[in-house]
């Protein structure tokens, strides 16, 4: 895999344009193939904007399968921002959001919620169903929730769900059906979490760049270092904002190799460019401290 990364011409692997933005990547690595899921923001000929959860696959981060839409064309839902894909109870489960813009809003309105979508084979996906992240609180009373992410804690047999609400909110579950609310911490959107030697690193979107936190128990977190911005200062395509990091662990020569997928907007920031031009990039590290990019 290291040779694949070294042979990359650019870290900018999926490029947006005046009608398409590619945002919020989530990545599953299976049998030598990257399954890259992301938000497609598509501006139609009449200027109407629709959002989808989409997929492409690649073995070399250079040649990609055609982008496949996995969710419906409906601004009341705008299924998007896949957090990650986990395997549980015989099925692959993807957590994702609705980003409701049915009235022409720029950002998702208060109807936005978080969902799970299931697949037996990674080829076809069932209709998403909502996550009731606060126990018996009805869906209509949960408030705006976006950007979910799931991680399993083996020693306690507990699933941890992180999502954007009042900072980074946190719920837990034993079965991915019934959840208990655990509270929230300071932090941004697009959380991604990885287990490293029994500790946990959280990556989240700061105002610009990818913030890093550490925890030994998935409940108490502290900030680590400065936000990651990789080669942003030299990348016109990401000079406006670099964000939404998704971490994946591989192995290289028996040692960990971490890939960080993210999206960038530029040269203007997201106050100017939001529904167009955003693209997906990649950086990599052997220790989560020293990063490489092209």
Which stretches of residues belong to each language-model region?
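Carbohydrate-active catalytic/glycan-binding domains of CAZyme proteins
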Residues: 1-294
């Amino acid at each position: 895999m290291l040779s694949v990364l070294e042979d990359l011409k650019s870290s900018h692997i999926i490029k947006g344009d005046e009608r398409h933005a590619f945002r919020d990547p989530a990545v599953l690595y299976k049998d030598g193939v990257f399954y890259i899921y992301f938000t497609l923001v598509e501006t139609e000929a009449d200027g109407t904007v629709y959002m989808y959860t989409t997929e492409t696959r690649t073995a070399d981060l250079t040649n990609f399968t055609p982008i496949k839409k996995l969710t419906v064309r409906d601004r009341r839902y705008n299924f998007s921002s896949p957090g990650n894909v986990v395997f549980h109870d015989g099925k692959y489960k993807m957590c994702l959001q609705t980003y409701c813009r049915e009235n022409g809003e720029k950002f998702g309105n208060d109807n936005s919620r978080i969902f799970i979508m299931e697949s037996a084979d990674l080829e076809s996906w069932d209709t998403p169903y909502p996550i009731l992240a606060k126990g018996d609180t009805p869906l209509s009373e949960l408030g705006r929730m976006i950007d979910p992410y799931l991680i399993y804690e083996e020693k306690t047999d507990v699933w941890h769900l992180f999502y954007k609400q009042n900072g980074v909110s946190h719920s837990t579950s034993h079965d991915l059906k019934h959840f208990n609310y655990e509270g929230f911490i300071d932090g941004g959107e697009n959380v991604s979490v990885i287990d490293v030697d029994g500790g946990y690193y959280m990556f989240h979107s700061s105002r610009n760049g990818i913030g890093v936190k550490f925890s030994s128990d998935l409940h108490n977190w502290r900030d680590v270092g400065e936000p990651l911005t990789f080669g942003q200062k030299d990348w016109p395509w990401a000079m406006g904002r670099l964000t939404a990091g998704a971490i994946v662990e591989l192995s290289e020569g028996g040692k960990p190799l971490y890939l960080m997928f993210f999206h960038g907007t530029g040269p203007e920031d997201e106050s100017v460019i939001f529904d167009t031009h955003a693209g997906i990039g990649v950086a990599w590290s052997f220790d989560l401290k020293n990063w490489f990019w092209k």
